[in-house]
């Protein structure tokens, strides 16, 4: 588990910046894929972020958990919606998903707190 999901996400920025500089076409394409897949359509963006969070838990991607917990929060997801999402991830991912679901609720709760001054 992370002591601070806000700090953890900020720590990824330099490495991601290097990746964008080193592989600009790949990262531009990846960004386009992300934007296209998360755009509102039959499903709204919040629902898509909740799906992405569930997949992040099931695939055990800490970085993805942080990014999608934050995005779900920014799109208005409630703690109750997060728990329902995590329940689905646990159902699909069994035991390991339980451990990563704990990461996801921890990330959501930390990211929902106002930044320390």
Segments the model singles out, each with a brief description of its role:
Residues 1-47, 99-117:
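Acidic, glycine/proline-rich low-complexity segments that act as flexible tails and inter-domain linkers
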Residues 42-59, 80-85:
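Immediate flanking context of iron-sulfur cluster ligation sites
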Residues 61-64:
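Short cysteine clusters
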Residues 67-79:
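Iron-sulfur (Fe-S) cluster-binding segments and ferredoxin-like electron-carrier domains
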Residues 76-86, 113-117:
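Charge-rich, acidic-biased intrinsically disordered regions
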Residues 83-109:
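C-terminal structural segments of small proteins and small subunits
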């Amino acid at each position: 588990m992370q002591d601070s999901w806000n700090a953890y996400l900020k720590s990824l920025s330099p490495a991601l910046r290097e990746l964008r500089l080193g592989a600009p076409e790949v990262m531009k394409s990846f960004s386009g894929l992300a934007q296209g897949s998360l755009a509102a359509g039959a499903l709204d963006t919040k629902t898509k972020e909740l799906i992405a969070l569930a997949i992040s838990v099931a695939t055990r991607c800490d970085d993805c958990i942080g990014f999608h917990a934050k995005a779900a929060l920014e799109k208005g997801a409630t703690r109750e919606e997060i728990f329902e999402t995590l329940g689905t991830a646990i159902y699909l991912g069994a035991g390991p998903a339980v451990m990563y679901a704990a990461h996801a609720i921890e990330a959501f709760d930390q990211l929902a707190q106002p930044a320390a001054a």
